Amino acid sequence: IVQSLVGSEMCIRDRPQILIENIIEDFKFKIPSGLPSIASLISGYFSYDTIRYIENIPNKCKDDLKVPDVRLLRPRILVIHDNLKKKIFYIVNIFKDEKISNYPKKYLGIKSDLSKLFTQSLKAKDKTTNEKKLAKINVKSNTSKNKFLSMVNKAKKYIKIGDIFQVVLSQRFETKLTKKPLDIYKKLRITNPSPFMFFFNFNDFQIIGASPEILVRLRDNKITVRPIAGTRPRGKTMTQDKFYEKDLLKDKKELSEHLMLLDLGRNDAGKVSKVNTVKVTESFVIEKYSHVMHIVSNVIGDYNKKFSKFKSLLAGFPAGTVSGAPKIRAMEIIDELEKSRRKVYAGGIGYFSANGEFDTCIALRTAVAKKDKFYVQAGAGIVADSVPKKEYEETVNKAKALINALR
């Protein structure tokens, strides 16, 4: 577990959740009016496997991706582009753990940093490389098609005997990294714009993503979760697209699965909300993306301040839409059936602001670039009447947007 602080890194292995909670809770101060809420923030990811520090989940899956379970950044210098206000903010933070002996000198240093930052931004150019389109991308999975089909059938047996109602099974796709990770992110912004777009450039790997789904959000003292469950591919024509939309909304299997996960989302929000404040503000609406469409609902509740921000995040972690129901047993089955630890996939990505708010999304439609490899993981929700072949195809369709960003 890695925590980055003002130019240094700290590896945490012993009960990391306690230290992370303390770091987040201690990171509080009033942001000056007129500045964005993210003018001072802690940002990064919590891998799916973070839950192993919280719950007693089996540890059979091998860790072959070799990235930290949690990686958080507390940036000192930020450039924030506010698309709504059409403004760019240049910000330098001073943290209370910095030892300052000469404040006038520090002030002049910050002014110099801001001046350099402004000058650099004026000189900045788009350095996207014009690489040739690949005629074919060779993709392999850590799970064969037959193995995935047998995983689905095994999960259905667990459902039949009453262990679970639903479980999300996934496979990890791997291909050669043929572009600079930042160029992939730039293309993804064009080809698959999503509510959450992110690019993290760590020293030894990069995370690139376009997630459609909130994990947990705290804003204006409101807790929000937004479950997404139920999928169809996008049509090649408007007529076909409309057909898929209608077909999705009348599919009893998809509707019952979504209702179950909506109830789970209400329960998660209720854990950290004031009594009798949780309500569904949107239910069973269709949201469309570049390669797939989904059924989406929205749940909000009044934040109960007796819970810390980190515990509020954990109330919905991992999301039921990427684990299953009941969560603990579903995660045990995931560990039994899947070949590798999920790591970044199905975890949480986002930020905690110094003003007490936070916003996180589920690490879906998310890739990890490491050395010369490009990894994309995708899953499908398995219920009693799941058709194994269709569930396999759903994972392939979900991964396409990221894979195609390499073209």
PLM regions and their residue ranges:
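Positively charged, low-complexity/disordered segments
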Residues: I1-E9
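Extended alpha-helical targeting/anchoring segments
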Residues: S8, R13-R407
